From Swiss-Prot:
Protein name in UniProt: Small ribosomal subunit protein bS21C
A cellular component term, taken from the record's GO annotations: ribonucleoprotein complex
Record InterPro entries: Ribosomal_bS21, Ribosomal_bS21_sf
Top-rank lineage group of the source organism: Bacteria
Keyword Ribosomal protein attributed: yes
Pfam families in the cross-refs: Ribosomal_S21 (PF01165)
GO biological process terms, semicolon-separated: translation
Biased composition (Basic residues): 45-70
Location of region: Disordered: 38-70
Organism listed in the record: Burkholderia thailandensis (strain ATCC 700388 / DSM 13276 / CCUG 48851 / CIP 106301 / E264)
Example of a GO MF term: structural constituent of ribosome
Length: 70
């Protein structure tokens, strides 16, 4: 569970921003959105495989030297 301590003389907006940042870092919002509806195991595997392929393409693209622009 994510908790934050409100510092003295700290505006509520700043504390709320800190709370949202900490929630996002833990990945709680992403997990909640994933659990809102059932995803079949085959669909989940397909989505994860596509994400892995995209990550690999991105990694290869970054490791290549930049193209020369004449």
């Amino acid at each position: 569970m994510t908790t934050i301590i409100l510092n003295p003389n700290e505006p509520v907006e700043v504390a709320l921003r800190r709370f949202r940042r900490s929630i996002e870092k833990t990945g709680l919002i992403k997990e909640l959105r994933a659990r809102t509806s059932y995803e079949k195991p085959t669909t989940e595997r397909k989505r994860k495989k596509a994400a892995a392929v995209a990550r690999l393409r991105k990694q290869v693209r970054r490791s290549m030297p930049p193209k020369k622009k004449y």
